């Protein structure tokens, strides 16, 4: 989950990792909030995900409900305490295992 699935250091750091995950062992859902910049980084992430959900400006509750409905086991929030963060989604506990990583 991130507002930075675009031309941004977060996307540049996670894209190749996501592209090389073993899909026989996991399914990748990416939840984007914030606006798309249409960059090649955004396009690569859209292609790399099994499910790419553009949540736009939806509320924390709506995003948490979608994540829960998708039966996500591990949720990693990539924004931390940066602009556009949605740490409030984690407070709603939409996944049994949750972490905040990479953003500060």
Residue locations for each model-derived region?
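Conserved nucleotide-cofactor-binding alpha/beta core module
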Residues: 1-104
């Amino acid at each position: 989950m991130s507002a930075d699935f675009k031309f941004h250091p977060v996307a540049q750091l996670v894209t190749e990792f996501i592209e090389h995950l073993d899909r026989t062992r996991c399914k990748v859902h990416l939840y984007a909030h914030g606006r798309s910049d249409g960059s090649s980084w955004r396009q690569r992430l859209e292609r790399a995900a099994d499910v790419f959900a553009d949540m736009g400006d939806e509320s924390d509750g709506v995003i948490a409900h979608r994540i829960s409905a998708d039966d996500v086991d591990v949720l990693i929030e990539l924004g931390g305490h940066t602009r556009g963060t949605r740490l409030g989604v984690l407070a709603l506990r939409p996944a049994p295992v949750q972490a905040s990583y990479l953003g500060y």
